[in-house]
Amino acid sequence: MRLEYCAFSRNAFDNRIRRLLAHELLVRREIPNMNRGVVYSISRAGASEMIGKGEFFSGSMDKGEPSSVHVQHALELNDIHIALKRTGVLVRWTPESDIRSRNEFTEIGYVKDYDAVVAVRLDGHEHRFALEYERTPKAKARYQAIRKRIETETEFRHFLYLVPNYDLLLFLVRAFEGCPRTVYFGLRKDFLAETLSLSVQSNHSPVSTAFRAVLTAGSLRPNGRGARSAQAALFT
């Protein structure tokens, strides 16, 4: 909240949370595997209220509560977002919910519901990349389908997968072997400590490099790709 300049007082924040809970716009959940941690999420009534105010939404209002695994993924992805926000280089963070809405309801979507599409400003230039936080591995057949989608992506050149451990990193490198698009892989803990300067490995080379150098290498594609770009900016 402080990073978004929405609240600076803890008491004011707590009072706001209590009011939202009282009006059943938020749901309070205790997560057993989080050492008595508590998570607040938007309720169905809260989601309905936000839809009425023009927020992006894709999916059923009748879905049940998310599993603890999904909650943990969301919290750890949020840590990644906050770490990048603190650097001051983040321009836009488009979350999966907005991406899914765009993909399902418009003609200017991406090829995949990424965990986030990130825009950062480095050395006076804006760079975008797709971000995936792969907390647990998928079946190999799933990665074959993902590879085919990534091969057709035209909105950006860079793809970053963050993972919790090195074994999973190597598994993903192998899963993306043969993909003509370069996909980069790094450790989540390194990103939290170094953000864009973290060391990454690609599916095309065993040599590690800083992800910041990957983003800034070469020239950016010029802006102004016609109506498609103009419309896309509305969503990012």
Q: What does each model-identified segment do?
A:
Residues 1-64, 233-236:
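Nuclease-adjacent, charged terminal/linker segments that flank catalytic cores
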Residues 5, 17, 21, 80-88, ...:
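Hydrophobic, Leu/Ile/Phe/Ala-enriched alpha-helical segments that form helix-helix packing faces
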Residues 29-30, 69-72, 83-129, 135-139:
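Active-site metal-binding core of divalent-cation-utilizing nuclease and nuclease-like domains
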